[in-house]
Amino acid sequence: MALLLLAGCVVAGYWYWLCLRPVEIVAVHEEDNHASVLVKNFPLTDKGKINWWRKNKNLLKEKYNIPKPSSSGNFTIIFWLFGDGYQEEGKYDRRCFDDMKTKVNCIDKNAVFAVRKYHNDDIIFATYEGRYTLDKNSNIIKNE
């Protein structure tokens, strides 16, 4: 019983540590109204990802000048885990960035979060677990 309790405490402590690590923005790559943000330590839960966006969207605008909406108001920001860092294209499932003039300009495709806005409508959040809408009243609604 004590061993089970100890294991539970270790797992809870590890989860707590994972949730408290600060997000590190490694790089931002842009193409028109699309941006790819390479991150380490991104929040694990949908709620954590959306809350991180809401807390840091002004910092992203000030420091990286993203999002850059098109003339119709569209933009897309995709957050990718930086994982093993930049690599050569080699593997079939990598995202490469043409703004880097080197052969080592790709990452493994591991998108963890996306923020999209279409035609000045509501903002859409996309995660592995679902899609959410941030309406004009700042309410977050899970899409079915």
Label each region the model flagged.
Residues 1-20:
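Hydrophobic membrane-insertion alpha-helices, especially the h-region
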Residues 12-14, 62, 130:
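Intrinsically disordered, low-complexity segments enriched in small/polar residues
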Residues 20-28:
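A structural signal for short, hydrophobic beta-strand segments that form beta-sheets
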Residues 24, 76-78, 133:
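Ser/Thr- (and often Asn-) enriched beta-sheet segments in non-cytosolic proteins
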Residues 30-43:
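Acidic/histidine-rich, surface-exposed loop or edge segments in extracytoplasmic proteins
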Residues 40-110:
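Mature extracytoplasmic domains of secretory-pathway proteins
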Residues 82-144:
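Non-cytosolic head/periplasmic domains of membrane-anchored proteins
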